[in-house]
Amino acid sequence: MLDHQFLGRSALVLGLSAALAGCPTGPNGDDDDAGIPILGDGSHDIESLDMAVIADSGDGLNIPRDLEFHSQRPDELWIVNRGDDSSTILLDAGTSDQESVFRGNTGGSAHFLAQPSALAFSDDGTFATIHETDDLTQGPNGTPEDFMGPTLWTSDLDIYDGGHGGHLDMLHNSPNGMGIAWEDDRIFWVFDGYNDSLTRYNFNDDHGPGGTFHGDAEIERHVAGEVRWREDIPSHLAYDQDTDLLYVADTGNNRIAVHDTTTGERGANHGPGYDVPADMQYTVDGGDCSTLIDGEAIDEMGRPSGLELHDGKLWITDNRTARIWAFDLEGNLLDYLDTGLDDGALMGIEFDADGNLYAVDAENDEVIKISVKSE
């Protein structure tokens, strides 16, 4: 069993958490003295930057909702598509040598990659996806409607198919999952829309490609009822390995929340018992989940969705206004960019090693790359 005691961190880090709980949400005006180049350096104008479409429906994009660079092959950009339960992989992404690879929409994709909301890579090159559905995914005589949760995958392109044969494991306690973030080893956090919680999944040992055994996992349901999903809009997550803080785009509550994952105490066991013994799935009660950024106090924030922790800053997209913000880790607004994209377009965002910004456009089935103009 995972040795996870919920005893909190050192006094120094606990002090940081307390400060976050009480800190202001940041200024609501411009800060031209602290402009960020990739957001227009205080101009907030997309015309001050280079924005290019690097992938579209011809590459298999079909309502793309999240994207992430491979943890070991940093030139590969992986994208998940809700429209047909699929994924698109861009090789040499954003360069003149770019090629696209399509996976999914195959045997088992309607369950194992059902309406994906988000993906997250671990450091060993495996990755996990989470899915927005609480419908039957294996036919009228198959598994129940709530038999959904995160899927663990190999990223070996000779094996990965986006379906049953390419999956390494799957757990089934979080229908309507809206975001996912990697913690360590085989541990992932999920924005659990069905239970309005942040749920920690430890897959432990996977069953191998195409297997079926799920019984060695551990599932912890944190801060139940304190976050709220919004249908059709992913609520992305970012886990900070240095502080054990989980940052949350809490879309339904129009805020950015922060959960101190080391707080709380083990509570009661919970169902449904589809995967693991009863004592291996339980609530964690009394954990600290506070508001870092109140969307009501930020101009044009109404449906925060994409969230990335990069370069010591939090980067947030708004699904309604297509604005991208950067905040410091105390919740202070640093800069923002108006992309000019459609209502409903922006969801997941990502950065490459050179600091270029990538985002999905779910309305137009595109991935865009934003770069600072060369002089």
Question: Which residues make up each language-model segment?
Answer:
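Short loop/turn segments immediately following the C-termini of beta-strands
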Residues: 72, 81-84, 131-134, 192-195, ...
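Short loop/turn segments immediately following beta-strands, especially the blade-tip
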Residues: 90-99, 154-161, 201-213, 259-279, ...
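Short, conserved, GDST-rich strand-edge loop motifs in beta-rich repeat architectures
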Residues: 130-149, 200-201, 259, 266
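Blade-level signature of beta-propeller repeat domains, shared across WD40, Kelch, NHL, RCC1
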Residues: 344-375
